[in-house]
Amino acid sequence: MQSLKKAVEQVKKDGAKTLFIEPGDYIVTGERARAAQSAVMAGDFGENPQKIMFTPTYEYDIGFDLSGLSDVKISAYGVRFIVDGFMEPVRIKNCENVELLGLTVTHKRKPFSRGHVTKCTPRNEENVFDVTVELDEDCPITQKTPMLLRYMWCDALSGKNKNGGIISYTYVDEHHFTAVVKCIGLCVGDEFNTVHAFHSRPAIHIAESKNITLTDVTINSQPGMGVVGNRSENVTLKRLWVVPECGYHWSTNTDATHFTSMTGKLRLENCVFEYHGDDFTNVHGYYQEVVTRVSDTEFFMQEKTPDGTHTQALDYPDVGDTLELTRKSDLRVLDTYKVEKVTLMPDEWMCRVTVDHPLPESTEGLMLADVTRLPFVEIIGCSASSHFARGVLLKTHGALVERNTMRDIHGPAIVAASEAWWYEGVSPRNITIRGNRIVNCGMFWGEAAGIVVKSDCDNPVSRNISDIIIEDNVIEAPLAEHGIYVRGADGVEVRGNIVKTRGEGVVLEDCVQY
């Protein structure tokens, strides 16, 4: 990696417009990266290593650091980064007009473990089995390795996921465990995959940048998310593949992509997403609470998401941004404010803000969101299959989701919903969902298999969602109750969809239709 670091520095020095990386395999590693993976596998970071590795003060290694580059195209076709350890393989920070092409990111020791069922004895209870799993030779574990954070059983030949849970787990040796499992259709030969950590650093981190494009990039694995973008403007992903390495049925431990506090246009075009541990994309801003008042117009505010921001960097508004004041219980928007002054306080995980007119006398139960930092999202011609959570999750004020194919996703394929309890906002507006094909999604959970639009809060009665168009989609989910579910939308049009479910195909609750 030293040669690549020198090449980046030379590009900065010379002002070159193209950086060509010689095709081949490159080991990307560091002492902290190897130590982190060893600590996770030994159980030194506890049952949920995210609590240590996903914090603002956690120190980690960075591999290919492009920070500060501008007006550069990096050609990495035929280049494979083989990551040894838990780290951030690629960083794009404070960059402008940068395109990364052709790179593949994978891991020497995968950040998950794979095994196969060698014994499967039925119990008296329906679909409950005594199971023995033999892990692959290159997937040794210890007695304290986290094994039950997120896992999946699947047919080893077809790759079809099976809905099952581990009732009890017993470590046998570094390549075997036994378990009592409840799973429909589990049998000898089925494959078992499990991650050993949730969020950590992303494979590709885009931050504080403008006009960034990833083209023909592949991410096979990562102990965290695939691509994370934060506080950046105009990001395009063209033919991004977040898919397992050949022969595997797991890619990234959590989200394939995740974008927060973005501006401009965010476009995902002809991308492929398979077998990751969460949504294929989640686009949102953050709700923040007023923690201390200085005056009617000056206050300290703090982001309150359970896990912190998704890059573990402070979220804050810029001078001139618009803040929306929202009631947490029903997500009703009460007022808007212009930001006149901001002081960042990263060590205290808050910022001091002055706005253009007074806040209410009491801000108990109220939240502020920066609605200037919401991109227009385009998700066009992508395909997704066999992964956890939702396909698309949108909390923005403008989006087009068109001509995508989604199959066998655990939850609903497309969701537009603010989440008060997770402090991710805002309530969606101006969303068009058109011409998508959705097959057998939402089989594990969700109000509908295909498309869900709602406010996720305690009292969703405020009709804070508006201007929603759902048209010409094909949804086939014969085991699901509903195909489309919309709640609390002021201005919704549902037309021209073909929906095949066992129950009512389209459900609209408390909506005003066009």
Region annotations inferred by a language model:
Residues 1-3:
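Mature N-terminal segment immediately following signal peptide/propeptide cleavage
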Residues 5-22, 26-514:
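Extracellular parallel beta-helix/beta-solenoid repeat domains
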